[in-house]
């Protein structure tokens, strides 16, 4: 869709009619009206008790589907809920999270790492040899105006549920935390996208070509084949 035509499909109240064909070949008409909807990619946040050999552990579960700024307040509320409930373990469900804002990914990783990672490397941004002067390090911080809420107290490791749809900013969080705490992956192998882009505009056209890679505090990156799970479990959601 050309940029000049975007208002035709993004303005609220626009009515569009579609003819679609089902798997059986039968056609039917659909009418859709555009509207504004509140967005949040936090679909579930809860705390449950898990029996252990030492007794019972309070485990927080967070299903997070996209790194968008609109989810900031919901993430903040979720972490407040986890702390109030006394959660000491976290299951972070990124099965369907294909990425999004690197700034928000840094905020989430910083909240998980807490004071032990504050000021440490979140991502070492590397351009090619012709643009090495643009390289920079993005540090962990709990004071960036994004996700200023509480860190999860007492967290020493994190369990992440993954799938082939786990990509980009999701993998960035996994890779960033690994130098500082155990990150246990459960599910499927992730997508494998250790690269990013900075949009460039030329002659009225904006290009989003890949132009940098990301490394963690140990210089680890280039996970083009994705991260393999520590415990492989097939997704039972069709």
Over which residues does each language-model region extend?
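C-terminal, low-ordered peptide segments at domain boundaries
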Residues: 2-87
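C-terminal "post-core" interaction segments
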Residues: 54-62, 66-89, 97-238
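P-loop NTPase catalytic core of nucleic-acid-dependent motor ATPases
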Residues: 92
């Amino acid at each position: 869709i050309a940029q000049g035509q975007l208002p035709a499909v993004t303005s609220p109240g626009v009515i569009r009619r579609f003819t679609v064909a089902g798997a059986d070949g039968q056609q039917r008409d659909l009418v859709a009206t555009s509207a504004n909807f509140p967005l949040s990619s936090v679909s579930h946040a809860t705390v449950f008790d898990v029996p252990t050999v030492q007794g019972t552990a309070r485990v927080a579960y967070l299903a997070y589907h996209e790194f968008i700024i609109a989810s900031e307040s919901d993430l903040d509320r979720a972490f407040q809920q986890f702390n109030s409930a006394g959660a000491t373990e976290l299951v972070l469900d990124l099965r369907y999270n294909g990425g999004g804002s690197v700034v928000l990914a840094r905020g989430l990783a910083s909240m998980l790492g807490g004071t032990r990672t504050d000021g440490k490397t979140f991502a070492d941004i590397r351009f090619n040899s012709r643009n090495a002067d643009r390289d920079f390090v993005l540090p962990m911080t709990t004071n960036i105006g994004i996700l200023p809420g509480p860190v999860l107290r007492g967290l020493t490791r994190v369990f992440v549920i993954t799938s082939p749809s786990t990509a980009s900013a999701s993998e960035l969080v996994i890779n960033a935390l690994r130098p500082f705490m155990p990150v246990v992956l459960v599910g499927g192998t992730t997508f494998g996208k250790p690269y990013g882009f900075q949009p460039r505009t030329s002659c009225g056209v904006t290009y989003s070509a890949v132009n940098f890679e990301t490394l963690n505090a140990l210089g680890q990156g280039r996970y083009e084949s994705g991260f393999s799970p520590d415990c492989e479990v097939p997704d039972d959601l069709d």
